[in-house]
Swiss-Prot record:
Biological role: Catalyzes the reversible phosphorylation of S-methyl-5'-thioadenosine (MTA) to adenine and 5-methylthioribose-1-phosphate. Involved in the breakdown of MTA, a major by-product of polyamine biosynthesis. Responsible for the first step in the methionine salvage pathway after MTA has been generated from S-adenosylmethionine. Has broad substrate specificity with 6-aminopurine nucleosides as preferred substrates.
Protein name stated in the entry: S-methyl-5'-thioadenosine phosphorylase
Family according to the record: Belongs to the PNP/MTAP phosphorylase family. MTAP subfamily.
HAMAP family assigned: MTAP
Organism, as annotated: Pyrobaculum aerophilum (strain ATCC 51768 / DSM 7523 / JCM 9630 / CIP 104966 / NBRC 100827 / IM2)
Annotated gene: mtnP
Reaction catalysed by this enzyme: S-methyl-5'-thioadenosine + phosphate = 5-(methylsulfanyl)-alpha-D-ribose 1-phosphate + adenine
Keyword Transferase recorded: yes
GO terms, biological process: L-methionine salvage from methylthioadenosine; purine ribonucleoside salvage
Annotated residues for binding of phosphate: S28, R70, H71, S103, A104, T203
A cellular component term, taken from the record's GO annotations: cytosol
Site (Important for substrate specificity): S183, A238
GO MF term set: S-methyl-5-thioadenosine phosphorylase activity
Length: 279
């Protein structure tokens, strides 16, 4: 195991000839992608504490890639307790500049069925008490990601790849709730009928905010596991979520393994997020 308290000065400290420019964040059920060659575990102490688990660094189709399980192996952290800042900063310290995240979500519309993939293009934040920014002062920055919160180039690669293996929807609005409880019927009706959202989850925010604050590109492939609570006699349960993730895990790994080598290492439009953001 490699232990770090500062960004590595050379990729040789990790046992590779280049830094991992691509990062994968695994969601519920995806604690080890099982697609790496020459994998090494890296324990990273960040200014924001330890991430949810050690970062795994290895090669995928020749590219050096980093992987971090969002909840930690064994699902140690519920959504509202995930160390989001440490997670994102640990990947940034290793050289990651583009992130592909995987999440389980509920569907808020009938045509986004359990078992489908969704590659969202917008989100609504309904979380309440998380650490949302790296800029708590004395420097203040207001990032503008509203037009394209999810990086289009990453989205397109995920969509094209996922469609080969599974029914996949291009676009959708993800409403992120605080959790860890699921929605009430009244809340679910608001997300669907008032907000016009398409999928619901608990982990996108502040993960996406933090990545974009550091100039990182970000894309998400979401697996629909349930219909939230709005379909009669089909209320969501943790058991149902876990069961669907287990059924689709092999396909998710195939999509990641095929998509990752095609991803851009870095895009100027992502790194320029802070260009006019700080006051």
């Amino acid at each position: 195991m490699v232990k770090l308290t500062n960004p590595p000065k050379s990729p040789k400290e990790l046992g590779f000839d280049e830094f991992p420019s691509i990062g994968i964040i695994g969601g519920s059920g995806l604690y080890d992608p099982g697609i790496f060659e020459n994998a090494v575990e890296v324990q990273i102490h960040t200014p924001y504490g330890l991430p949810s688990d050690n970062v795994i660094v290895g090669r995928v189709a020749g590219r050096v890639v980093a992987f971090l399980p969002r909840h930690g192996r064994g699902h140690k952290y519920p959504p509202h307790k995930i160390p989001y800042r440490a997670n994102i900063y640990s990947l940034y310290m290793l050289g990651v500049r583009s992130i592909v995240a995987v999440s389980a979500v509920g569907s808020l519309r009938p045509d986004y069925a359990p078992g489908d993939f969704v590659v969202p293009d917008q989100f609504v934040d309904m979380t309440k008490g998380r650490e949302y920014t790296f800029y708590d002062g004395p420097r203040t920055c207001h990032i503008q990601i509203g037009l394209e919160p999810f990086t289009q180039e990453i989205r397109q690669i995920l969509i094209e790849t996922a469609k080969k293996y599974n029914r996949t929807h291009d676009g959708g609005c993800y409403v992120c709730i605080e959790g860890p409880r699921f929605s009430t019927k009244a809340e679910s009706r608001i997300w669907r009928e008032v907000f016009g959202c398409d999928i619901i989850g608990m982990t996108l925010v502040p993960e996406i905010n933090l990545a974009r604050e550091l100039g990182m590109c970000y894309g998400l492939i979401a697996l629909v596991t349930d219909y939230d609570i709005w379909v009669p006699h089909q209320p969501v349960t943790a058991e149902a979520v876990e069961k669907m993730m287990t059924e689709k895990l092999g396909i998710i790994k195939k999509v990641i393994a095929e998509a990752v080598p095609k991803l851009p290492a870095e895009l100027p439009k992502c790194s320029e997020t802070l260009k006019y953001a700080c006051v």
